[in-house]
């Protein structure tokens, strides 16, 4: 004969209140310093202004309103933590934050990247975040230097300048 003893179940196996299924998770704020170019700071300000304007006429607490509020909290946080990095203009000896770096691949094709802040990065526009693998490999590089990453292969720095 089997007898069972009913003991309280461990809290680890009890699902806590999951909250509203439509609740949106907050956007992740990077723990890395929020370095931005002057253009990046302006873009963050425009983004915050745009979100505030779009939120103004929206009634209630629908999904769109909650998404806009979440995005506004994110970009207000990014704006508040922004550290503008000033850089030289014109030609430069070394690649640093804000630099536009001209590169040549082994096959002879050209590549141009700008080292920018995390929120400014847009690979399709040649803008790479300062903490990306490629940007970190480029930091301190000089004209004629060869850098290599797993994703890009070997690249030769052909020019460095600042906007």
Can you say where each PLM-predicted feature lies in the sequence?
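Helix-rich terminal scaffold detector
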Residues: 1-78
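Charged, amphipathic alpha-helical segments
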Residues: 76-87
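Non-DNA-binding regulatory cores of transcription-related proteins
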Residues: 86-155, 161
């Amino acid at each position: 004969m089997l007898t069972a003893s009913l003991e309280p179940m461990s809290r680890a196996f009890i699902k806590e209140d999951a909250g509203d299924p439509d609740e949106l998770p907050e956007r992740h704020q990077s723990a890395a310093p929020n370095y931005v170019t002057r253009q990046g700071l302006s873009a963050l300000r425009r983004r915050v202004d745009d979100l505030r304007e779009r939120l103004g006429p929206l009634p209630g607490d629908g999904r769109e309103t909650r998404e806009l509020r979440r995005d506004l909290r994110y970009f207000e946080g990014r704006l508040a933590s922004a550290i503008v990095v000033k850089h030289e203009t014109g030609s430069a000896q070394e690649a640093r934050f804000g630099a536009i770096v001209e590169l040549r691949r082994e096959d002879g094709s050209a590549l141009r990247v700008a080292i920018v802040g995390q929120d400014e990065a847009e690979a399709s526009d040649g803008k790479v975040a300062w903490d990306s693998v490629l940007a970190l490999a480029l930091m301190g590089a000089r004209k004629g230097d060869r850098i290599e990453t797993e994703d890009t292969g070997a690249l030769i720095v052909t020019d460095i300048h600042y906007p």
